[in-house]
Amino acid sequence: MSRNTSVALGPHFTSFIDAQVQGGRYGTASDVVRAGLRLLEEHETKVKALQDALNVRHQSGEPRPFDSEVFLSRMHTQHG
């Protein structure tokens, strides 16, 4: 359900929105704002996913050392 919301914008963003509408890329100022909010939502979703991954890593404890030679030797032994 849509609702009208009043937002105060400075001259920079007002000019930017006007240019997007006048250039034909968007039909209305609301279209421009919705596009910007979709991008912000996508960005915030990615940031949250990264934060969640970092939290999982942090909670998993200290990393174990990795020896590539031992790993390769084990893979050759197991898989020929």
From Swiss-Prot:
Q: Which CDD domains match?
A: RHH_NikR_HicB-like
Q: Which Gene3D superfamilies match?
A: Antitoxin ParD1-like
Output the Pfam families linked to this UniProt entry.
Answer: ParD_antitoxin (PF03693)
Q: Share an example GO biological-process annotation for this protein.
A: regulation of DNA-templated transcription
Sorted alphabetically, which InterPro entries does this protein's record hold? ParD, ParD_sf, Ribbon_hlx_hlx
Q: Which UniProt keywords apply?
A: Toxin-antitoxin system
What function is annotated for this protein?
Antitoxin component of a type II toxin-antitoxin (TA) system. Neutralizes the effect of toxin ParE.
Descriptive protein name: Antitoxin ParD
Q: What is the lineage of its organism?
A: Bacteria, Pseudomonadati, Pseudomonadota, Gammaproteobacteria, Lysobacterales
What is this protein's gene name? Answer: parD
